Amino acid sequence: MNQERKQMLMSREANRLVLQRTIFLMVLFGVVIFLPLFWQLYRLQVVRHDELERRAVEQQTSELPISASRGTIYDGNGNVLAISSTVYDVIISPKAIAERQEELDKKKETAAKKGADTAPYDWNVENVVVTNLSQILSLDPADLRSKCADTKSQYKRLAQKIEKDREDKIRNLMESYQLSRCIYLQPNTKRYYPYADMAAQIIGFTNDSGGAYGLESKYESQLAGTPGLLVTAKNGAGTDLMNFFQDYYDPKDGNNLHLTIDPTIQNYAQSTLEQYCERYQTQNGGVILVMECKTGRILAMAQTPTFDLNNYSSVTDETLLSQIEKQAKEAVEQSEEEVKAALAATQEAGTTLSPEEMEVKTYEQAYQEAYANAIYKQWTNKCITDTYEPGSTFKAMVLAAGLEEGVISEDSTFECSGSVQVDTWTIRCSARSGHGHQNLAEAIGHSCNPALIAIAQKLGRQTFYEYLERFGIMDPTGIDLPYENVGEVWPYKDFHITQLATASFGQRFEVTPIQLITAFNTVVNGGYLYTPRVVDSITDPNGGTVYQADNTPVRQVISEETSRRCCEILEGVVSKYTGKNAYQPGYRIGGKTGTAETRKKNSGEYWVSFVGFAPADDPDVITLVMFDRPKSVDNYSTVTPRGDVISGGAMAAPVAGELLAKILDYRGFEKAYSSEDLTGSLTPMPDVHGMTEQQAKEIIFAKKLKYRTVGTGETVTGQLPDEGRSVPQNSTVILYMGEEMPSEYVEMPDLTGMTPKEAMEAMNELGLFMRARSASGYYTSSSVVTDQQAAPGEKVHRGHVYKVTFTDASGN
């Protein structure tokens, strides 16, 4: 019994062990088998959840981007310079075309069974679509028919950005044949530039990818906006189900740019530049910049050549087109010469040329290459990328540095013998015989190189170089335009005594036009260096301000007192010296001329320029006018074929003066005449006794005088004033024609309270002549007579000149 029990227990233990082992093996087997499955399930449901969900959505839906409306660009007066208008992309649904055909076929069959007219259904949908759309969109019919054959697709884009005329034709087609499910016009946007070439290099242009150049590129993130989405369902075959499910996400329109450019001033600058570039036959056009002195805002940025923003890949400039033809011919000739030279070399060496090496460039190939270069050239913003030697315009910065450092003053004197020796180099002055003894104002007015070298030497190499840096000559200005270049200046380690000398008169280093006007503006605006800019503000589609430009200067380079002293000296350059061609009566203009030979020495090629500012006593605007290589008679001439002298004073100064006068008038500045403006310089009265009126008129006008006659005789019998008596120019003299003769004396009128013009007319009427006087030296419409040399009612000699004193009645 005990033995049996013992065996039974042992059997149970054995079974239990077997069961445990079996369970363990089953569990182990289960773990081995199912653990990877559980891991894979975990990966699918947890680790890759987001990815798989996205892929599922992609397989089940289609996302069609909806273009956002690009922001508008406005000029400083709120006129639209660049705007996006709604245009349309043309899309067809081959599946819907096939379904429409099936629908027609069924209706035709039903009508035939009923004995009804089948003509309304007796046409082919695909033929109608292909025939009409290929004509409207100028597409290849065979290519369009192959697209229609893909009947599983519901989306085939045929054309992009069609305009209203073609849109209307397609809508008529859709309506006439009930093709609204077959043809779809998807809204898109197209960029338009209403003023075509106005400020073209500033604004830039767009392509299919967005902003490609200029502000359109620089501010792409602001202008572009955020596209919307049209989400539609797709079936298992991947076909769009446009009418089954749709979800529309609105696009967010782009922000708007508001520029500093004044359209009136920009047009002044562009038209003036084009006129004179044509006159001077400039080989590489020119530039005009206009900046607001106390803010750095760019009011105009003009250049030639330029282009039409609506057709930016076309060249229309006559000078560029002629250069393209010339360059193409030269390229072909050069290619022929290279092949000839290569053949000669191979014959000598006993080798041969490959067919490619023997190929001569065709005129068509050369023309296309030259045309592409011309397109790039007209896109280039010369104002911020081209570099040139500033020449004597840079002397304004040397003047400012010298006055600020106290190494010179208005009382400083300079000797000029016509040249100066610097190290082993003889540097000549423009006046080969020299200017002799001169003070500071005269030295700057004469643009005397030896005097400027002396100032630079007094400053010293280190201080001079520091001012190059402080005036911003070493760095980009930071203007808010892409691709700004920076000039070429010696590194300090290479800046020695000869470099110091040539730098003093603006040669052997280069700047961009924007660098030069920014530095010069610092000299005259109180000494403050501003960052130039063309974008004044950015607004959102609702008009809210996103960005407002800051007018804070970067730094003060010279004191306001030094700046005032510079303005006085530079005004003298215009009123008395090399810049006198910029002089405009009634306007106080200051400035500096510049003439520099290009990199091709002894080529007769020059950069001629002038920087002018006004009003000189409180500068409001500053302009840079630069002509790039006016055409000369020959390589050794400084005269153009039509006789213009190639120099900054002869070419650029009058253009700048004319432009500044227009700008000041436009901006509402009152004219302020000097006594010379008002009454002219004194001129001796000629003897016209016995002459006819016509003979006397010619002589009197040559003296810059006016006249009136008394009497009806044939010849002059008397005149006021007498022969040889000096009278102010612009005065009206009296010619007596006949027996009537003037009395010797006349009563002086009461001139109190009269304006300069009124006083002059009142005196001239009586045969008296006025010499104006004013405490400020200038006269405006607010100036009135407060004193007169001869008292009212006093007997005075006819034909004599009398002093009249004016005071500004406005209280300013």
Give the role of each language-model region:
Residues 1-361, 378, 387, 462-474, ...:
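Periplasmic/cell-envelope proteins involved in peptidoglycan metabolism and beta-lactam response
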Residues 5, 82, 88, 235-248, ...:
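Beta-lactam-recognizing serine transpeptidase/beta-lactamase-like catalytic domain environment
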Residues 87, 153-155, 252-256, 381-385, ...:
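Short, solvent-exposed beta-strand edge segments and adjacent coil->beta transition regions
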Residues 143-151, 190, 282-295, 415-419, ...:
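Acidic/histidine-enriched alpha-helical segments
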Residues 196, 617-619, 729:
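Short flexible coil/turn linkers enriched for glycine and charged/polar residues
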Residues 495, 549, 586, 590, ...:
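Ligand-recognition elements built from short beta-strands and adjacent flexible loops
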